[in-house]
Amino acid sequence: MTEPRVNPNCRLEDQGITGLGNVHYNLLEPALIDAAIQRGEGKLGLGGTFLVSTGAHTGRSPKDKHVVRTPAVEDSIWWENNRPMEPEAFDRLHADMLEHMKGKDYFVQDLYGGADPALRLDVRVVTELAWHGLFIRNLLRRPEASELAGFLPEFTIINCPSFKADPARHGCRSETVIALNFDKKLILIGNTAYAGENKKSVFTLLNYILPEKGVMPMHCSANHALGNPNDSAIFFGLSGTGKTTLSADPSRTLIGDDEHGWSDNGIFNFEGGCYAKTINLSAEAEPEIYATCFKFGTVIENMVYDPDTLELDFEDNSLTDNMRCAYPLEQISNASETSLGGQPRNVIMLTCDAYGVLPPIARLTPAQAMYHFLSGFTSKTPGTEVGVTEPTPTFSTCFGAPFMPRRPEVYGKLLQEKIAKTGAACWLVNTGWTGGAFGTGKRMPIKATRALLTAALDGSLNDAQFRKDPNFGFEVPVSVPGVEDKLLDPRQTWTDGAAYDAQARKLVGMFSDNFAQYADKIDDDVRAAAIG
């Protein structure tokens, strides 16, 4: 006899969601793909992938994300970065969405957020689109069939792309809405089919919940040395900076590519899958990720393909620069079976410098690491957010401001404590431009970045000779095997040294202006490490 695939005492009607058409609980991948094809949501691709376009929204909509303002969360939410929504407006939104859902079929996935059983979040994701069920099943952690019979969700996400919000009635910015209600343990998503909103909603929940447990939630990828989970490394970075690419290293075991927690036990992945950008993806540069684009169950999102042969075009960005594939971790041959690692020995902060000023790698003191973590300097890459069409320099605190419900200092102090306790080495790595700014310079060669990271992770880089950067105060290696010396000194890569100096001074000023907001909230050693 097969196990029931849902808790019989926790169906949607038990949560007050009634009047729907057929409700499909915890379908497996073949059934979800079959349903999505029958419903005309997309096409079956080569190898059993699912090809889909998300329509108008091909990236996240951070300006349409709201947190419901209640006394319970009033003092703990970073309101300067999170748009408030009044409880009464949320209730109207909730009621109107439930009314809109009546008579329609829905797909329910009961999943875990977090590989550490003691810290995981039990999440129910209710989706209008069958392929969204496949996506979130790929991305989160899948319970065993025997666990589903007793599954009780702590939070529920309802995603209804066909629902358009009414800004006047629902207290939101536009017809697109992502509304988080921590009191009601409910997230409502409307008028966007971009699947990334589902996974980032779970990330936002964990970013709120875990700090109270002394756990540092991080927008980072992570891996560890082969056969040694205690030699782990984390890679902070905004979307498009190289988290997925650089952590998928054949010589190391992948823990995860995007979202992790750092507890007293070490590192744990929040997810059970990866959501990789596919623009200009190649079998030569990234063989593991490329191979997933032809494996059963992978969701291929917003990629152009030949209608006759179904061959994917990895260079055609006519739909978006933010084309992606979503696949379960087990599709990566060197992925960890547990998604766990020990205390990190190396903390790497990835920045995509569109000004072409920062070196390819720099060694940071713990105070400098705290400074750069709070600064979060990088560039938004095209397509990752609505309206971003070219690399746009930005300061995204904690390398993930759109997903941080609490104030930055909360996460910064947690990181400071973790680094102090473990003695992890800290590095800043520029995967952006060299030899000039975006438009004149070129992207940092990935071979050089990989060589520098290998040297940092195996410890050999600590034996190199370092120079102190005159503009930013951190230490930069003078020579590293396998990397052109000139590349390590960004001023030498520019044809006009004076132009480099001017650009560097400009960036120093930007760092200084941005960091003023944290000046009264940090320790003296971090203040002393400030740039400018």
From Swiss-Prot:
Pfam families: PEPCK_ATP. The keyword Lyase applies. One of its GO terms (molecular function) is phosphoenolpyruvate carboxykinase (ATP) activity. Its cofactor is Mn(2+). The keyword Nucleotide-binding applies. GO terms for cellular component: cytosol. Keywords: ATP-binding, Cytoplasm, Decarboxylase, Gluconeogenesis, Lyase, Manganese, Metal-binding, Nucleotide-binding. ATP binds at residues 200, 219, 237-245, 286, 324, 449. Its EC number is 4.1.1.49. It is an enzyme of class 4 (lyase). It comes from the Bacteria. Mn(2+) binds at residues 200, 219, 258. Pathway: Carbohydrate biosynthesis; gluconeogenesis. Gene3D superfamilies: 3.90.228.20, Phosphoenolpyruvate Carboxykinase, domain 1, Phosphoenolpyruvate Carboxykinase, domain 2. One of its GO terms (biological process) is gluconeogenesis. InterPro entries: PEP_carboxykinase_ATP, PEP_carboxykinase_C, PEP_carboxykinase_N, PEPCK_ATP_CS. PANTHER family: PHOSPHOENOLPYRUVATE CARBOXYKINASE (ATP) (PTHR30031:SF0), PHOSPHOENOLPYRUVATE CARBOXYKINASE ATP (PTHR30031). Involved in the gluconeogenesis. Catalyzes the conversion of oxaloacetate (OAA) to phosphoenolpyruvate (PEP) through direct phosphoryl transfer between the nucleoside triphosphate and OAA. This is Phosphoenolpyruvate carboxykinase (ATP). The lineage of its organism: Bacteria, Pseudomonadati, Pseudomonadota, Alphaproteobacteria, Rhodobacterales. The gene is pckA.
